[in-house]
Every structure is written in structure tokens, then in C-alpha cells.
């Protein structure tokens, strides 16, 4: 039989575990700085930017994102994806400082975000983004592609919080997607 002090201790432990579970279940939105390209990647890509594309991309408003729920999940909002894209374009030298003078418009749509309902162990996230680059004057499509990238965040990265693992996997999948987009754009022939 439990004594009165151990009964109080047991109640406190149960209460503490319940509170920890509630806190771990809070939604964790993706963070724009974590989705943008790293400094080393940006510097490397910056050196490959052709003159015809340097400071010539205007980023249009991003679509398809979703706000993160209050209690569960790790979604990607339009505003955080917009910020990550804008900073990545700026860091690589593609972003047009004066949008009215940009030769091209970049249109981005978050088509699909595949996440597990609950990341029991590793969090495996796949993201599909649709990219379209059109001429600002004339509207001719220069580049159009759907890119799907996948990232897995291991259990040890955030053992107590499955939403944190999903957030980290989502951010890394977006970062990989942006890297692929920029590398493909730099390989195209651009008029000077």
C-alpha cells in the first residue's frame, strides 16, 4: 500500500508527465531562417550566376502554404516560405533590388507537404514545390518545374518532441528544394 507522501509524489509525477506531453504537442511552425540556403551554399552559387540572371528575379507572392495548428503539427506558411526564398535569392545575387526593373518573375506554389501524423521515431517529410519563371514583359514561360525533395530527421535530434522533428525535417526538405531550384536556374542559358 502507498503511503500518503508517496501518493502525493506519484500525483506530482503524473501531473508533470501530463504537462510535458501537452507542451510537446504544441504546434511548431517552420522557421524562415532555417529554410533558407546556408552561407556556404549561397556563396558558392553566387559565383556561378550568369550576367543575364544577376539581380533579375522578382519574387511574386508565394501560394499554397498553411499556418501551423495551435496544438499539433509543423506546417509551412506562405510568409515564412516567402522570406526564405527572398533571402536565398538575395544571398545568391539573383534577387532584383528594384522589382519594376526585373527581367523575370518567379512564381512559387507549395503543392504538397507530406508529413506523418505523428513522428514516433524518425520524421520523414517530403515537400513538392512548383516553380515558374516568366518574362516580366511578354509573359513567356522560361522555366517551369515541380520539384519534390525528401528529408528525414532522426529521433535523436529531438527525442522529446515529435513536432520539433517534423519542423526540422520540413525545413531541411525546403532548403534542399531551394538548392535544387537555384542550381537548375544557373544551368540554363540566359540572354545578356
Where do the protein language model's features map onto the residues?
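Short secondary-structure boundary motifs at beta->alpha junctions and helix caps
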Residues: 67-76, 138-184, 191
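Surface-exposed short loop/turn segments
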Residues: 27-37, 92-144, 151-164
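N-terminal export leaders
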Residues: 11-15, 26
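A structural "domain/chain start" motif
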Residues: 2-7, 26-83, 186-192
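Structured segments of extracytoplasmic/periplasmic soluble domains
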Residues: 84-95, 180, 184-191
